[in-house]
Amino acid sequence: MPREVLSILVDNHSGVLARVSSLFGRRGFNIDSLTVSATDDPEISRITIVVHDDVKVLEQIIKQTARLEETRAIFPLNTAHSLLRELLLVKVAADEANRTAIREIANIYKAKIIDLSIGSMVMELTGRAGKDRRFSGCAFTL
């Protein structure tokens, strides 16, 4: 099944995310990814949801989400004309013995080390779908 991305403009107040996500859950729709952010208008938020479903199920999702009182607009994004990126933040155990090896792996994947402490390291990785899965599949201890 193809990956579909929905951009939903909703009223910016508490409980809206819960209503949208519970609609998906009650109907048995699986959410692969969910992001919520503010817009230029402080009264409106944008919810971006990624799902893997067929066209008929996607149409049903769009219709039911559009019926929610807080929904202002819903747009399916054309993934062929969109730049889709994923973000991974991972904290790993990093002592003197393995810190160099972890840095080498981070460099291969172009991950940024954003925090370093005595016993751990936090890395950030952005890229196309799948890059984060390959990176997190490396032999790290969390």
Please state what every model-predicted region is.
Residues M1-S45, V50-L142:
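Long, contiguous binding/interaction regions
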